[in-house]
């Protein structure tokens, strides 16, 4: 039947000589309609399309050997599937268990039954569903509805099937095909300008785009526009829309494309959201325990120490004790606040601080000028210094402060060790900020303690203080008795 119109061997020879394009698929002039057999009459308007389909089938054979993902044809070429070369290629595929005579593609090796293959990309496996595509019925040809594509059991990997298209394709009525078959000129068919061909190309391109996005194992020939024209003839899943005229078929193809585009985008956004969610959660878990190590809260660092130093001594309260008392409470940040973690603080509202100091000392005429003169008295005693370049900014010298309060303490070694290290901090960040040399040790942590001579037999305070705590992450038993209330070390 096909030898009367065009030679299949001639088309294959042309394909071997040069890559086929839409302008090269025409191999022979159309023979007279009287030379055509009666069965060929209903297909006569598909002459150049058939030649393209033949070349596409050959192309699909080569793609199948390259582990391509799209393969199929129309029922009119069912005899091609019985060829020795294709049968051997199909036999090399893994056989599906419990399928009888089928393979992983679900293709029965029965040359007498004409079936179409609807291949859908499922990662590296090709799941397919066989259904009748074209049938000859009296006066015209009617395209039947493709069943919902489902992957055969046992072939697809145990992963999310991104490429399976579950929506059923619409039905193209016979009126659409009859309108296309009324075109008498062969060049118009060769240039694929008919609405039927355009509709197939548009529908198949959306299918190819959807599957190509879902996996990196798509056929290389499906990435260009020309190969879309070739691959579009053999893809079994089509997003066709019903239309009564030939021109309407081309216009209605966009609906199917939009359907599959939205399907594709929903999968893409879902997968990207999932991956971003996992990565952000992992980063959050990784960075959470260390977020406070980078930016420790000075109120939690200096709070217990400030309160204890402010209440130390006997007799009337001194100005530096009063300032430490205000700094120990973060609610007083409107008038005085810590600046960083090196002992620096700033009088945000110096008049309010002076007023509160006057209330404490029963001096209602107290102002900032008198208070600042009193602060200068502490410069010589190394209790605090003025921060140059900043207004209303001062800095406590904890070493001089400890030396000033040492005579009032009965056992300074035990006092400072227990007060500064054994206080129940709520997080390890507050503890490590006093011990780790990476958190301003030269300005605040080291200056909290008096000189090495005043510690008696503590020959090397840095070695004795920092070594067990720096090893606490490796051997927690060194500090476990003292850190039972710390959730970080639990």
Swiss-Prot record:
SUPFAM superfamilies, per the entry: Winged helix' DNA-binding domain (SSF46785)
Source taxon at top rank: Eukaryota
Keyword Signal part of the UniProt annotation: no
Basic and acidic residues: compositionally biased ranges: 196-207
CC terms in the record's Gene Ontology section: nucleus
Tissue: Embryonic ventral nervous system, higher in the thoracic than abdominal segments.
Residue ranges for the DNA-binding region feature of this UniProt entry: 317-397
Subcellular compartments: Nucleus
Keywords tagged on the record: DNA-binding, Nucleus
Ranges of biased composition (kind: Low complexity): 211-227, 271-280
Spans annotated as Disordered: 190-255, 271-294
Alphabetized GO MF terms: DNA-binding transcription factor activity, RNA polymerase II-specific; sequence-specific DNA binding
Pfam families xrefs: Ets
GO-annotated biological processes: cell differentiation; regulation of DNA-templated transcription; regulation of transcription by RNA polymerase II
UniProt-listed PROSITE patterns: ETS_DOMAIN_1, ETS_DOMAIN_2, ETS_DOMAIN_3
Compositional bias (Gly residues): 244-255
Entry-linked PANTHER family: DNA-BINDING PROTEIN D-ETS-3, ETS
Protein family (similarity comment): Belongs to the ETS family.
Name of the protein described by the UniProt record: DNA-binding protein D-ETS-3
Organism: Drosophila melanogaster
Protein's gene: Ets65A
């Amino acid at each position: 039947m096909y030898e009367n119109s065009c030679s299949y061997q001639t088309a294959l020879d042309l394909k071997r000589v040069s890559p086929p394009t839409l302008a090269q698929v025409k191999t022979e002039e159309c023979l007279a309609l009287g030379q055509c057999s009666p069965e060929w009459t209903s297909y006569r308007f598909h002459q150049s399309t058939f030649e393209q389909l033949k070349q596409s089938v050959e192309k699909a054979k080569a793609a199948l050997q390259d582990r391509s993902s799209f393969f199929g044809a129309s029922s009119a070429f069912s005899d091609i599937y019985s060829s020795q070369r294709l049968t051997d290629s199909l036999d090399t595929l893994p056989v599906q268990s419990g399928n009888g005579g089928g393979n992983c593609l679900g293709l029965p090796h029965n040359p007498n039954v004409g079936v179409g293959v609807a291949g859908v990309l499922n990662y590296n496996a090709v799941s397919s569903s066989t259904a009748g595509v074209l049938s000859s019925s009296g006066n015209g040809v009617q395209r039947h509805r493709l069943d919902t594509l489902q992957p055969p059991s046992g072939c697809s990997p145990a992963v999310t099937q991104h490429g399976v298209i579950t929506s059923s394709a619409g039905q193209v009525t016979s009126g659409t095909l009859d309108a296309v078959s009324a075109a008498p000129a062969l060049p118009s068919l060769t240039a694929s300008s008919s609405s039927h061909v355009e509709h197939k190309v548009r529908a198949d391109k959306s299918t190819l785009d959807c599957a190509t996005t879902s996996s990196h194992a798509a056929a290389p020939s499906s990435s260009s526009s020309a190969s879309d024209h070739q691959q579009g003839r053999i893809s079994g899943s089509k997003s066709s829309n019903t239309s009564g005229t030939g021109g309407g078929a081309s216009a209605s193809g966009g609906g199917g494309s939009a359907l599959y585009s939205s399907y594709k985008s929903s999968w893409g956004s879902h997968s990207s959201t999932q991956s971003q969610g996992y990565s952000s959660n992992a980063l959050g878990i990784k960075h959470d325990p260390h977020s406070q190590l980078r930016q420790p809260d000075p109120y939690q660092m200096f709070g217990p120490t400030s309160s204890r130093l402010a209440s130390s001594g006997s007799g009337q309260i001194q100005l530096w004790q009063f300032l430490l008392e205000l700094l120990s409470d973060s609610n007083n940040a409107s008038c005085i606040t810590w600046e960083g973690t090196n002992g620096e603080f700033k009088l945000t509202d110096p008049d309010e601080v002076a007023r509160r100091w006057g209330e404490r000392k029963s001096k209602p005429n107290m102002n900032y000028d008198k208070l600042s003169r009193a602060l200068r008295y502490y410069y010589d005693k190394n209790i605090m210094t003025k921060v140059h370049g900043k207004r209303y900014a001062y800095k406590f010298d904890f070493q001089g402060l400890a030396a000033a309060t040492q005579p009032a303490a009965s056992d300074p070694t035990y006092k400072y060790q227990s007060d500064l290290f054994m206080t129940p901090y709520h997080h390890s960040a507050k503890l490590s900020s006093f011990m780790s040399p990476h958190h301003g040790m030269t300005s605040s942590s080291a200056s909290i303690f008096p000189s090495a001579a005043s510690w008696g037999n503590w020959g090397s305070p840095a070695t004795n203080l920092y070594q067990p705590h720096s090893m606490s992450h490796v051997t927690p038993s060194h500090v476990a008795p003292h850190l039972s209330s710390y959730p970080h070390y639990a």
